Amino acid sequence: MTEHKNNKKRLLAWLLLAAALVLAAAALGMARFGMGVWPYPVAAAAAVLLIVAVAFLRPNWAALAATLASLAFLLRFAARGYAWWGYALLFVAALVVLHHFLPAVLWKIVVILTCIGLVYFCVVESFIIKNARTDADDGRDYLIVLGAAVYGDRPSLTLVRRLEGARDYLQQYPDAVAIVSGGMGPGETVAEGQAMYDYMTAHGVDPSRILIEDKATSTEENLVNSFAIIRERGDEPQGKVAIVSSAYHLYRAKLFAQKFGVSDAAGVAAPWGYFFVMLNYFIREAFGVTHFWVFGN
């Protein structure tokens, strides 16, 4: 009787695993052909089925590593905004494999290096989190809004939240002028700066209070070009600039501002989005900050 039950559980587990693979393939296809939000719930359902199947199978190390790698694959390719969760799971899967194959001495070295890496990661995140807030409470003259993805001519959700933060600031400080900064990237039919201008004017912001910068393709260029616009107006950015961006991005944006001589740029944190998506970008930002510390850009 027990063996019969175990066989039924194994059969159910393999059926669930097959269903998970079908749903995963469907999610990837939907994402590939741009089918709106549908890839996300389908990918989530695939992940749930995969986890349940693994629970039934009671996996050995190889099955556990394969499961983690499969979940990482789903998060990386089928769920927009969760790629760095996928990388994290892939790293854990690699640790599972290394634990099985490495001699004890080498495994201890891997554990020590991993712990050092985690401590370093926490240190970097402390700087990012400390600056992930609005500190522009003194009415700066210029508000630089950093661009983000545009789908065709439509601002992404991340960019919309930045624009909402900028609009709120302009309402609070009626003498401030916004500089919307961003060039045209892949898949975009208008420059990000123009898309931001169109969105803000359509949502009640006076066009005379918005200056367009439409050439920048990076945070560095956003700030260099925006500072140049301020100087062309006969002004200096020092003491007069606030930067609008996603909360996780403000620390690095301020580092770039300091690099170009504006040591007191304030930050305006855009409203937060989905919690786990935001955590994904906080994870990613640690690598961006590290790149700046090492290479200066």
Predicted regions and their residues:
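Membrane-anchoring hydrophobic segments
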Residues: 1-44
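Membrane-interface helix-boundary motifs at transmembrane edges
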Residues: 2-8, 53-60, 100-110
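Alpha-helical transmembrane segments of integral membrane proteins
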Residues: 11-14, 60-64, 87, 105-115
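Aromatic-anchored segments of alpha-helical transmembrane domains
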Residues: 20-29, 67-78, 117-122
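Membrane-embedded alpha-helical segments of integral membrane proteins
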Residues: 33-100
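Non-catalytic propeptide/linker segments at domain boundaries
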Residues: 89-127
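A structural signal for short, hydrophobic/glycine-enriched beta-strand patches
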Residues: 105-107, 116, 123-282
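A transmembrane-helix-recognition feature enriched in membrane-embedded lipid enzymes
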Residues: 278-297
